[in-house]
Amino acid sequence: MAAKDVKFGNDARVKMLKGVNVLADAVKVTLGPKGRNVVLDKAYGAPTITKDGVSVAREIELEDKFENMGAQMVKEVASKANDAAGDGTTTATVLAQAIVNEGLKAVAAGMNPMDLKRGIDKAVVAVVEELKAISKPCETSKEIEQVGTISANSDETVGKLIAQAMEKVGKEGVITVEDGTGLDDALDVVEGMQFDRGYLSPYFINKPEAGTVELENPYIILVDKKISNIREILPVLEAVAKAGKPLLIVAEDIEGEALATLVVNTMRGIVKVAAVKAPGFGDRRKAMLQDIAILTAGTVISEEIGMELEKATLEELGQAKRVVITKDNTTIIDGIGDEAQIKARVAQIRQQIEDSTSDYDKEKLQERVAKLAGGVAVIKVGAATEVAMKEKKDRVDDALHATRAAVEEGIVPGGGVALVRAASKVATTLTGDNEEQNVGIKLALRAMEAPLRQIVTNAGEEASVVARNVKDGNGNYGYNAGTEQYGDMLEMGILDPPKVTRSALQFAASIAGLMITTECMITDLPKEEKLDPAAAMGGMGGMGGMM
C-alpha cells in the first residue's frame, strides 16, 4: 500500500480553501448578463469557448492533491445542480464558495464546526420554504420566453425559439437541441407519433419527388413477430383490399417471399401497402407497439397472448388519418385512439419514470410520453463556426432546462434578488438552539447575497452599493445588470425558476457544510521515480576487450 500524506486542522482547511477558490474564481466570471467567456484548451482541434459554469468546472484539475480535493468537492456542487435542474451551476458554485469562506473564518475564530453546520442547514431549509412562498406560476408564453432569454445569457432569439417549441408540442412534449446547417437557428416540429424506422423497400414509395410513402386513412396492423410467409398475412390483405384503404404493416421484420409479394402487389396497384420494422428492441419494442396500438385503437397481434396473424380481422387493426414514411422515420398522424385510454397510458408511463433509477430509461420513457401526449420539437442551432456553435448549444441547453424548471415550479425575481429577499425575511424570524448556531444562520444568510454581488461585479459596478440598494427595496425590486437600471424584476423580464435557485442553494450548503466540518485530509504521497540500475550502466558495452 502506498504511503500517505496527512494534514490536520487549519493546515488541511487552508489547502482545501485554496482549491475551492481557484475553481470558483474560474467559474464565477461567467455569471450574469455581462459575464465573461472562459476558453478551454482541447487536446485536439480548436479551443472551446463557453459561458456554462459546469463545463468550466469539469475542466479543472489541480496539481496539489489537497487543493484538488477542495476543487473537486465544489465541482460536485456544480454537477449536482446541473443534474437536478440543468442550470444554476455557476450560482451553486458562487454560493458554495461564499459559505465555505465565511464558515472557515468562524471555525478559525474558535467556533464549533458542528453547530455552525446545523445553523447553516436551518437557514437553508427556511430560505427554501420562503422561495416556495414567493414563487408564482409560469403560465404565459411571454414568461417562458423571458426565462429562456435570461438563462441563455440574454439571447432573445433563444428564448423565443423555446417558447415557440413549448407552444407547439405542449409542456409534456420532447424538445431536443441539435447542430444546425446554416447561420440561423431553426425550429422543426414533428406532430403525431414518430419512430426511427423507415420503409423496408424503396418500391413502396408513392411520392417520388419527396422520396416518401404517404398513406391517407390507412389501416395499421401491429405484429410482434417476424413475417416470412405471405400466407400468414393474406387474409388481412384481402380484407383491406375489399375495404379500399391502404395498409401499414409494423412488424419485428418482414423478409423473403412475404416482402417480395407485398412489393409486387403495391407496384401493380392491387393493394396499397407499406411495411416498416417495429421500433426498439426486446421489452421496449413490445411497449412501443402497445403505445401505437393505444394511439390508433388497434391490437398488437402477439402469439404470447394466443393470437394468430392468419385469423386477424379488420376490428383488430388500428387506424390513423395519415402516415408518412421516409428512409429513416415513420410518422403516424392523428390516430383514432380513445383520449381516455391515451391519458391512462401516459399516466402509467409517468409512474414508471418516477420508479426508474436509470437516467437512460427515464429519457426513453419521457420520449414515449411525448410521442403519446404531444409531439417532438427539434431546435437546430446555427452559427458561423464550430466553436461558436458549441458555445451557443451549451446556452440553448441551459435555457431549455431552466424553462422546464419554471413550468414545473414557477418563477421568482431573478438576478439574485429572490435569495436576498428570502434571506432578509428569514433573518427576522429564525434563531438557533445556541449562539454558535446563530452564527451559522447569519453566515449562511450573508452568503446568499453572493450571486447578486457577483452579477454586479461582472457588470463592472460596485457590488456593495447595489446590494445595499436592493436590500433597502422590497418585493420584486432589484437591479438589472444588463441595462444598469433598478426596477421590478418581473416587469423587466428578469426571472429565475425557483427549482434552479433552490437546487443551487441546497447542494452548495450541503457540500460547504461537509468542508467546514473537515478536520483531516489524507492523500497518496507522490511516487519517487527510481532509476533502474541496469539502465544506469548502459554505456559500458565497449569495455568487453579488457582482460
Swiss-Prot record:
Q: What is its EC number?
A: 5.6.1.7
Write out the annotated subcellular location.
Answer: Cytoplasm
What name has this protein been given in UniProt?
Chaperonin GroEL
Family annotation (NCBIfam families): GroEL, PRK00013.1, PRK12849.1, PRK12850.1, PRK12851.1
| Main location as per UniProt | cytoplasm
User: What PROSITE patterns does its record include?
Assistant: CHAPERONINS_CPN60
Sorted keywords for this record are: ATP-binding, Chaperone, Cytoplasm, Isomerase, Nucleotide-binding
Q: Which GO terms describe its biological process?
A: protein refolding
Q: Which GO terms describe its cellular component?
A: cytoplasm
Q: Which residues bind ATP?
A: T30, L31, G32, P33, K51, D87, G88, T89, T90, T91, G415, D496
For this protein, the record's InterPro entries field holds: Chaperonin_Cpn60_CS (IPR018370), Cpn60/GroEL (IPR001844), Cpn60/GroEL/TCP-1 (IPR002423), GroEL-like_apical_dom_sf (IPR027409), GROEL-like_equatorial_sf (IPR027413), TCP-1-like_intermed_sf (IPR027410)
Broad enzyme group? isomerase
Q: At the top level of its lineage, which domain of life is listed?
A: Bacteria
Organism whose genome encodes this protein: Actinobacillus pleuropneumoniae
The UniProt record lists the keyword Nucleotide-binding: yes
- Main role? Together with its co-chaperonin GroES, plays an essential role in assisting protein folding. The GroEL-GroES system forms a nano-cage that allows encapsulation of the non-native substrate proteins and provides a physical environment optimized to promote and accelerate protein folding.
User: Which reaction equation describes what this protein catalyses?
Assistant: ATP + H2O + a folded polypeptide = ADP + phosphate + an unfolded polypeptide
Q: Which GO molecular function entries does the Swiss-Prot or TrEMBL record give?
A: ATP binding; ATP-dependent protein folding chaperone; isomerase activity; unfolded protein binding
Complexes and interactors: Forms a cylinder of 14 subunits composed of two heptameric rings stacked back-to-back. Interacts with the co-chaperonin GroES.
Q: What family is this protein classified in?
A: Belongs to the chaperonin (HSP60) family.
